Amino acid sequence: MGKIKIGINGFGRIGRLVARVALQSEDVELVAVNDPFITTDYMTYMFKYDTVHGQWKHSDIKIKDSKTLLLGEKPVTVFGIRNPDEIPWAEAGAEYVVESTGVFTDKEKAAAHLKGGAKKVVISAPSKDAPMFVCGVNEDKYTSDIDIVSNASCTTNCLAPLAKVIHDNFGIIEGLMTTVHAITATQKTVDGPSSKDWRGGRAASFNIIPSSTGAAKAVGKVLPDLNGKLTGMSFRVPTVDVSVVDLTVRIEKAASYDAIKSAIKSASEGKLKGIIGYVEEDLVSTDFVGDSRSSIFDAKAGIALNDNFVKLVAWYDNEWGYSNRVIDLIRHMAKTQ
């Protein structure tokens, strides 16, 4: 199989990091980027310098002309087109398009990319109607006739593998999740208008902000056994990257906390290696910046009330881990064709 050729629509936090992952992958080739809101020289600057993930040092990045970037010696076509149905992906050779604008998240809107010659579209956000796949959980349900998929959210990618391991081994009766979540681009630097979410309009760098999240309910879509058994909420906190899930569950099969730890450790070394991590060191959030795993279980941070009621803690780099899964999902889709 030749290299998997991808295009990226929307060069924001996830778009740029997916580009970084692609450029460090031997089996994936980035051939095109579309963003109508930034010029090619600014795109170069934003790609090269990153406050959280550091300066790009893997290859030179240069501007060949207003419509072409050179990454090393490899040309990447740049478009600046607003309407997704007008982007000529086929011209650039892009077969898989990562839809990372955060705008075209339903099937109908994302399907516009197919008109320009894309074969498949991966939405880097939850979708109300596109099938959601979480690597390590339900990607085996993908079939080659599905053209538009969602990679779910970063939080669902952390929660679902952990929930799967617990449910497979001990059976989840019900559970509540809280994610303590780093700031994202939709928040405000200072208090500002946010008519749909009043709390969300408050200054991100100065507040702990309670917020809603569909991540726990979405687990029921990728693990139908857990449909209706999990829900959750979020606290947005003043850190720029790395979030942490607190999953509190009642389990059917009585188990000591040590037995639960052992099941997760075993999964992290076996089938879910690279998806689930396991740590026993006394780590804090910045220790996970740049960690490509979806869900890193913190054995020391969790606690059991009794053999049927337990709180589990898992870290995730909500930017880098998620961006790696976008590429992993594309790899899986390409293999399935």
Swiss-Prot record:
<protein>
    <recommendedName>
        <fullName>Glyceraldehyde-3-phosphate dehydrogenase 1, cytosolic</fullName>
        <ecNumber>1.2.1.12</ecNumber>
    </recommendedName>
</protein>
<feature type="binding site">
    <location>
        <begin position="153"/>
        <end position="155"/>
    </location>
    <ligand>
        <name>D-glyceraldehyde 3-phosphate</name>
    </ligand>
</feature>
<dbReference type="GO" id="GO:0004365">
    <property type="term" value="F:glyceraldehyde-3-phosphate dehydrogenase (NAD+) (phosphorylating) activity"/>
</dbReference>
<keyword id="KW-0560">Oxidoreductase</keyword>
<dbReference type="GO" id="GO:0005829">
    <property type="term" value="C:cytosol"/>
</dbReference>
<keyword id="KW-0963">Cytoplasm</keyword>
<dbReference type="InterPro" id="IPR020828">
    <property type="entry name" value="GlycerAld_3-P_DH_NAD(P)-bd"/>
</dbReference>
<dbReference type="GO" id="GO:0006096">
    <property type="term" value="P:glycolytic process"/>
</dbReference>
<feature type="binding site">
    <location>
        <begin position="213"/>
        <end position="214"/>
    </location>
    <ligand>
        <name>D-glyceraldehyde 3-phosphate</name>
    </ligand>
</feature>
<feature type="binding site">
    <location>
        <position position="184"/>
    </location>
    <ligand>
        <name>D-glyceraldehyde 3-phosphate</name>
    </ligand>
</feature>
<feature type="binding site">
    <location>
        <position position="318"/>
    </location>
    <ligand>
        <name>NAD(+)</name>
    </ligand>
</feature>
<dbReference type="Pfam" id="PF02800">
    <property type="entry name" value="Gp_dh_C"/>
</dbReference>
<dbReference type="InterPro" id="IPR006424">
    <property type="entry name" value="Glyceraldehyde-3-P_DH_1"/>
</dbReference>
<feature type="binding site">
    <location>
        <begin position="13"/>
        <end position="14"/>
    </location>
    <ligand>
        <name>NAD(+)</name>
    </ligand>
</feature>
<feature type="binding site">
    <location>
        <position position="82"/>
    </location>
    <ligand>
        <name>NAD(+)</name>
    </ligand>
</feature>
<keyword id="KW-0520">NAD</keyword>
<dbReference type="GO" id="GO:0051287">
    <property type="term" value="F:NAD binding"/>
</dbReference>
<comment type="subunit">
    <text>Homotetramer.</text>
</comment>
<comment type="similarity">
    <text>Belongs to the glyceraldehyde-3-phosphate dehydrogenase family.</text>
</comment>
<feature type="site" description="Activates thiol group during catalysis">
    <location>
        <position position="181"/>
    </location>
</feature>
<comment type="pathway">
    <text>Carbohydrate degradation; glycolysis; pyruvate from D-glyceraldehyde 3-phosphate: step 1/5.</text>
</comment>
<dbReference type="Pfam" id="PF00044">
    <property type="entry name" value="Gp_dh_N"/>
</dbReference>
<dbReference type="InterPro" id="IPR036291">
    <property type="entry name" value="NAD(P)-bd_dom_sf"/>
</dbReference>
<dbReference type="InterPro" id="IPR020831">
    <property type="entry name" value="GlycerAld/Erythrose_P_DH"/>
</dbReference>
<dbReference type="GO" id="GO:0050661">
    <property type="term" value="F:NADP binding"/>
</dbReference>
<dbReference type="GO" id="GO:0006006">
    <property type="term" value="P:glucose metabolic process"/>
</dbReference>
<feature type="binding site">
    <location>
        <position position="35"/>
    </location>
    <ligand>
        <name>NAD(+)</name>
    </ligand>
</feature>
<comment type="function">
    <text>Key enzyme in glycolysis that catalyzes the first step of the pathway by converting D-glyceraldehyde 3-phosphate (G3P) into 3-phospho-D-glyceroyl phosphate. Essential for the maintenance of cellular ATP levels and carbohydrate metabolism.</text>
</comment>
<feature type="binding site">
    <location>
        <position position="236"/>
    </location>
    <ligand>
        <name>D-glyceraldehyde 3-phosphate</name>
    </ligand>
</feature>
<dbReference type="InterPro" id="IPR020830">
    <property type="entry name" value="GlycerAld_3-P_DH_AS"/>
</dbReference>
<feature type="active site" description="Nucleophile">
    <location>
        <position position="154"/>
    </location>
</feature>
<dbReference type="InterPro" id="IPR020829">
    <property type="entry name" value="GlycerAld_3-P_DH_cat"/>
</dbReference>
<keyword id="KW-0324">Glycolysis</keyword>
